[in-house]
Amino acid sequence: MSAPFPGTLIDRSFRERIVLVGVVFPGTSAEEVEASLDELALLVDSAGADVVGRVVQRRDHPDPATYVGRGKAAELADLSRAVDADTVVFDEELTPAQQRNLEKLLGRTAIDRTAVILDIFAQNARSPEGKAQVEMALMRYRLPRLRGRG
């Protein structure tokens, strides 16, 4: 199935294999994170991909470089290879630097919940105005993430 919108983030020519990642921070329960990952799994399915793994980590705060820390990122890389995942989706917003660092460490695409939601909107935009609005939102999302990609 080909993408109906040229700016989508998940490749719909096949069903991408996705690993989900959630982090339990102080003040948040493991049950809340699991419920959020369940919702994210539904979003990923709506975007046309299959969840093949999920990882939850407890942390006091996000790692500024990799969000989950280098050790967990290495575990994610191993898991992603083992389950032949195409993409790793984080339940929380990644900074552009975190996304770049994770993609280097994981050896595959790393995106966040916002990217999945934008992708669903891109897939379902039909009117010219809707397509233009989605394209603008995608450009705003991607702009800070373009450094070093050209």
Show where each model-derived region lies:
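Extended, highly charged alpha-helical segments
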Residues: 114-150
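N-terminal accessory targeting/assembly segments
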Residues: 1-119
